[in-house]
Every structure is written in structure tokens, then in C-alpha cells.
């Protein structure tokens, strides 16, 4: 039987990335909350840099 978590950087970026967060009102709310909290990384794509492309 296959395990449930099959990691893929593309899916990870598309589902939880910065662009997706910015595209909705609630997503922007998440980002501002993470900024206010002082999180090191705001979203998945911001921690990737150019290596994730």
C-alpha cells in the first residue's frame, strides 16, 4: 500500500506558495499574521529561493 504523503515541490509551491496566499483576502491575512509574529519564512515559496524552480 502506498503512503499518503508523496512529496512534490511543485505541488507544495502551488498549494501553499506566496502567490496563492497573496491572491486571496484570507491568504493575505495569513501572511500579515506571520509577519507580525516575526516568522523566519512567510510561505513555502519564500524559503525555496531560486533552487525550487
From Swiss-Prot:
Pfam families: Ribosomal_L34. Residues 1-53 are annotated as: Disordered. Keywords: Ribonucleoprotein, Ribosomal protein. InterPro entries: Ribosomal_bL34, Ribosomal_bL34_CS. PROSITE patterns: RIBOSOMAL_L34. Transmembrane segments: none annotated. HAMAP family: Ribosomal_bL34. This is Large ribosomal subunit protein bL34. It comes from Chlorobium luteolum (strain DSM 273 / BCRC 81028 / 2530) (Pelodictyon luteolum). The gene is rpmH.
Amino acid at each position: 500500500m502506498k503512503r499518503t504523503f508523496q512529496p512534490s515541490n511543485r505541488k507544495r509551491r502551488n498549494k501553499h506558495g506566496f502567490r496563492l496566499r497573496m491572491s486571496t483576502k484570507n491568504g493575505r491575512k495569513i501572511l500579515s499574521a506571520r509577519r507580525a509574529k516575526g516568522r523566519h519564512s512567510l510561505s513555502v515559496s519564500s524559503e525555496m529561493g531560486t533552487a525550487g524552480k
